[in-house]
UniProtKB/Swiss-Prot annotation:
Signal peptide: none annotated. The lineage of its organism: Bacteria, Bacillati, Bacillota, Bacilli, Bacillales. It catalyses: adenosine(2503) in 23S rRNA + 2 reduced [2Fe-2S]-[ferredoxin] + 2 S-adenosyl-L-methionine = 2-methyladenosine(2503) in 23S rRNA + 5'-deoxyadenosine + L-methionine + 2 oxidized [2Fe-2S]-[ferredoxin] + S-adenosyl-L-homocysteine; adenosine(37) in tRNA + 2 reduced [2Fe-2S]-[ferredoxin] + 2 S-adenosyl-L-methionine = 2-methyladenosine(37) in tRNA + 5'-deoxyadenosine + L-methionine + 2 oxidized [2Fe-2S]-[ferredoxin] + S-adenosyl-L-homocysteine. This is Probable dual-specificity RNA methyltransferase RlmN. GO terms for biological process: rRNA base methylation; tRNA methylation. The active site is at residues 92, 341. The keyword Methyltransferase applies.
Amino acid sequence: MEKSSIYGLTWTKLTEWLEAHGQKKFRATQVWDWLYRKRVKTFEEMSNVPKETIELLTANFVMNTLEEQVVQESTDGTTKYLFKLSDGNLIETVMMKQEYGLSVCVTTQVGCNIGCTFCASGLLKKSRDLTAGEIVEQIMNVQHYLDGRNLEERVSHVVVMGIGEPFDNYDNVMDFLRVINHDKGLAIGARHITVSTSGLAPRIIDFANEDFQVNLAISLHAPNNELRTSIMRINKTYSIEKLMEAIHYYVNKTNRRITFEYIMLKGVNDHKKEALELAALLGEHRHLAYVNLIPYNPVDEHIDYERSTKEDVLAFYDTLKKNGINCVIRREHGTDIDAACGQLRSKQIKRVGVRERMKQKQAAAEE
């Protein structure tokens, strides 16, 4: 049987597992400290943990199921990682240098089934969910990279906005959040973590009822059903009306701000008409609504879309501001590398596919 990642256990689950296997409760504190504070890479390095416990952990868990395949570094300090999972699938993770610290964007699924027509992530359909351990390991691999530079840098912020729909992998994502937020471990503050959803309305309600204050972002991208359905297939299942009902519940339950992500597509959703519709849609919650206008990263496979002009983006921004909506134009990261989410993975899979076809042709020619 394949061993699971030790990083998939929350503090509570690790404690319960050790106690169920005859270990004293305080062993969880020791193991947790070695994992997240001292950040060792093998169980054998846990020097104050008894040999019996080390053998128990080694027999049941592994500490790294990700294998680094490609690392791309941008001139602006953005670093993009391509990891291979134990089953051979590929995922992406991105570290971004911000004015407020180091932010990491994690992937939650292998591929994506949401079907946004402008997105590189959806080019490859979802094959499975990531485990909580595989999501945590993305953070740990980046932190180990930082530790190796001896600059005392740490991951301070996390955005769950990589490949996949986080709320379609809800339980594993919640365990991931509890691991990285735990005050005896990485201790990444809940308000420094943002989870983005394309609009799974029932899960937004579930998220409102959780016991932590992690930020929520909504990938909206259009202010009306006709337009949103044309670029986001999920709108057929959860219309803007259903989405706004869930958002209304979330706001009333948490009194927390929501970020609305809006990708700027030339001639599609960037007119004054859409800006006015968006302002009206968010008007009821304008005191807690924050719109993030995102310049589009062109993708080779999506030739129908272009980036909105700077003038149109600024005009859209001005219209929102004049109508009382807080908004910002997102700063771009990694423009000199494969910046679009899913782009690096897609290119790597294509390269592997080409190599395999060449090998097959060569083998056939030799027969």
